A protein has these predicted regions:
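Eukaryote-biased recognition of intrinsically disordered, low-complexity regulatory segments
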Residues: 1-7
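Fe-S ferredoxin-like electron-transfer domains
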Residues: 46-190, 196, 203-218, 222
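Iron-sulfur-associated redox domains of electron-transfer enzymes in respiratory
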Residues: 10, 15-75, 79, 205-441
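Extended, non-catalytic structural segments that build the interaction scaffolds
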Residues: 7-9, 139
Length: 441
């Protein structure tokens, strides 16, 4: 164990522990912006600097390890001056129009500026404008980028794609798509991990809420919403709702209060998907000599994009079935439209999904089997739905729980577990077992 002193407190930690982690063990919080444990420990933002007795230079707490007898000051006058100056320099190249930013209230840079009391900048603003296709599901605003490199490291080390890289030099250095390509030309799978790990609003999903509000305001439209299984567990987080209050029944009620005509459960079409994929697997197993194994699910558009971009030789091993969301859209604009006597061209189908890649999937030209229109008109992320709830001034905690509409609102346990890791495979095995044996496993 290594013994040291941090802000007057005795600390004992294992050798190799960073100063940042050592401080955290005794409840001392050192602010960070670029830091991601084990992924991005580069000290680029210089916000986590601390003073070490006997060393003239301030050092980054995130990538410097503890030493025996070290005396650390995390908030000395010297540290406070340097930390504030570093933050002001970052803000000088950052678009601070926070009121129109989707990350307002959930932005690390904004929070740190408030904590340090930075309300005016002593430096002239210098923004680095960079054109971007606003029609792509992933939106990047270079004016909000602070060059923390989080997106680069997550894409490279976790996803293994390396879509992002540094471009240009010196004061013109910025993050951009690797190799000077456009984002459409890259191998981006639209997994959304770079958005999740961006500490500012430099990366976000394309906002499609206006399309839904317009449809709700159109008396000619019949708005149908389907909710993916994973959404029910996450929709209340950004609204600050505890888990026991953020029930799927209250989400259904909130959507109806907005004016949605029918609210269905994507679990229904998850069952359809797994029956299709299970049947396909059994058929392939019966004709082994004609097929290559393993067979992969096709229900995740991010995974499908990955296979086609990075492992195209596996494309023929993907299931031929549509994703649950697309199946649901097709059923809505065919069977359901006929059942209710609704012109399918008047149905506006919205899916609420936990995935940015779904925005790409709904725009694929061949996804229009039912009536020639897109099977699904708009795909919203969980965060977009939460923004709609706030925009409508709906207090979900006051709403009584409501049930899904029928007949597309019921499902088996196989459909429900789609939202969990490994759920699709387990659902497929359960379904195949039932088809072969005639009873549940």
């Amino acid at each position: 164990m290594v013994n040291l002193t941090i802000d007057g407190r005795a600390v004992s930690v294992a050798e190799g522990t960073s100063i940042l982690d050592a401080a955290a063990t005794v409840g001392i919080k050192i602010p960070t912006l670029c830091y991601l444990k084990d992924l991005n420990e580069i000290g680029a933002c210089r916000v986590c600097v601390v003073e070490i007795e006997g060393i003239d230079q301030l050092v980054a707490a995130c990538n410097n390890t503890v030493l025996e007898g070290m005396v650390v000051r995390t908030n000395s006058p010297k540290v406070r001056v340097a930390r504030r100056m570093n933050l002001e320099l970052l803000l000088a190249t950052h678009d601070s129009e926070c009121t129109s930013c989707v990350r307002s209230g959930n932005c690390s840079l904004q929070s740190l500026a408030a904590d340090l009391g930075v309300s005016e900048l002593p430096y002239e603003k210098r923004l680095m404008h960079d054109p971007w296709d606003k029609g792509f599901p992933l939106i990047r605003n270079n004016d909000k980028c602070i060059n923390c490199l989080r997106c680069i490291q997550v894409c490279e080390k976790i996803q293994g794609l390396g879509v992002w890289d540094l471009a240009n030099r010196a004061t013109h250095t910025s993050v951009n798509v690797r190799g000077g390509m456009t984002i459409q030309e890259s191998d981006c799978t639209l997994c959304g991990q770079c958005i999740t790990h961006c500490p500012t609003g430099a990366l976000r999903e394309r906002d499609d809420t206006r399309k839904v509000f317009d449809a709700l305001a159109d008396p000619e439209k019949v708005v149908v919403v389907q909710i993916a299984p994973a959404v029910r567990a996450a929709w209340g987080e950004s609204l600050g709702l505890p888990r026991e209050e953020a029930t799927v029944g209250r989400l259904v009620a909130a959507l109806r209060q907005m004016g949605v005509d029918y609210v269905f459960d994507t679990d229904f079409s998850a069952d359809l998907t797994i029956m299709e994929e299970g049947t396909e697997l059994l058929h392939k197993l019966a004709h082994r000599e004609e097929n290559t194994f393993p067979m992969f699910t096709s229900c995740c558009p991010g995974w499908v994009r990955y296979v086609k971009a990075v492992r195209p030789e596996l494309t023929d091993q993907l299931s031929t079935a549509k994703s649950p969301g697309q199946m649901f859209g097709a059923v809505t604009k065919s069977y359901f439209a006929e059942l209710k006597g609704i012109d399918p061209h008047k149905i506006f189908c919205v899916e609420i999904m936990p995935c940015t890649a779904k925005k790409h999937e709904v725009a694929i030209p061949v996804m229009n089997d039912a009536c020639g229109d897109p099977d699904v008109d708009v795909s919203l992320t969980t965060r977009e739905v939460d923004r709609m709830i706030r925009a409508e001034h709906i207090d979900a905690t006051t709403l009584p729980e409501e049930e899904f509409d029928q007949p597309l609102g019921t499902a088996t346990g196989a459909g429900v577990i789609f939202g969990a890791t490994g759920g699709v495979m387990e659902a497929a095995l359960r379904t195949c077992y039932y088809m072969v044996v005639g009873k549940n496993p």
